Amino acid sequence: MEVTRIRALRGPNLWSHHTAIQSVVICTAEEDAVSSIPGFEAKLRARFPEVSPFQPVGHLESVSLARVLELVALGLQAQAGCPVTFSCTTPTVDKHVYQVVVEYSEEEVGHLAMEWAEKLCNSALHDTPFDLQAALEALRELDEDVRLGPSTGSIVDAAVARGIPYSRMTEGSMVRLGWGSKQRRIQAAEMDVTSAIAEAIAQDKELTKKLLSAAGVPVPGGRSVVDADDAWAAAQEIGLPVVVKPNDGNQGKGVTVNITSREQLIRAFEVAKEFRDDVLVERFMPGNDFRLLVVGDKLVAAARRDPPKVVGDGVHTIAELVAQVNADPRRGSGHSTSLTKIRFDEIAKTTLANQGFNADSVPAKGQRVNLRNNANLSTGGSATDVTDDVHPEVAARAIAAAHMVGLDICGVDVVCDTILRPLEEQGGGIVEVNAAPGLRMHLSPSFGKGRAVGEAIIGSMFKKGQSGRIPIVAVTGT
């Protein structure tokens, strides 16, 4: 068997509406009917038991090795967790030559699946070893590397549900929605009309606070500092406890909250300095951490974020309890899973030390131990959906903050006791405004129901009835 002329069909095609890998497969006369190859099917199934039946029940036609290649390529992707269902094999006008078409969800994964399928078929033909788990692991790892993240993926899924065509413009998260003059573009949760100036403002936390304060939105007081001594001076001006963080950081990196001593502040300053030279000290706002998602002029989702923590059982150390929590299949090392693994870094060690613990401590049964004081999902926190609980005045403040910065998709971080009451009544405030906010806490919260945030974003980009398509009468070529 020779597999040639492999190419990707990146849209609706002669065979189906699915994206697919198409190849021309040349078989020998014997390979035109695998039933004539002694022991082939048994050897193949011994190596890959999950492969589909070569023919539906009741069909007696001979099956070519090209057809087996098709089924193996599809089955390997399915076993690796890729959502694929379509494949077909069609003979050509040339004897022993077939067109094999196999759906893919990610182009690179489709190509690799075809390569592994050819190796598996040859292994069964020549009775040589084949490592199925290595093949599946390679496909899974590649799929995780190249597939769209949850934020971009949710927007693309919403577009597909609306009949809006899409194509990836880069190997990253930049995607084209629609065709020609009707097209729009996204990169993660950021649209093509997002202002570069608005994004720059959102990255500058101190400037953002000045704008929000001028608009009457409650924010914590604070200022930029140049060194540890200046940071302590700022803390004295503001009043302890304080928060120290990079002025243009993200995902909670380098953030230390609830600092009550000079020693803690110096350590926090050093941690923040590792991420950015410009460091901000601001008043610590006690309360819960909420993320409100604004799209256009609407609040579309809200979640309470809780810091990463473990609960003692009186037997295991904190390090062992963290390992147990990280074993949850929902937790991963990136943003492709609904939760992120808790990691032991300097901030985690400092947080433990402030509670009188270290990694080898054994907390009492039922005792809660925080690994961080900030609640970002990217550092191992969890999320609870609270969209239905948001007070109208809190929603109005979040929308006003997004508009003041100029963002059309905006993640507004609020700290307060409860979002059931206005911020001013409880001394709460808006602590950050984020461009390109992560959506996974709203799509798959740890607790509560997921929200259709991808649909909300697509709805803001394409009016009802619009599909981003241009009518095509015919396609010709030579």
Regions found by a protein language model. Name each.
Residues 96-237, 250, 473, 478:
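Conserved N-proximal alpha/beta basic substrate-recognition cap immediately N-terminal to
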Residues 167-168, 280-282, 411:
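A structural signal for short, well-ordered beta-strand segments and their strand-loop junctions
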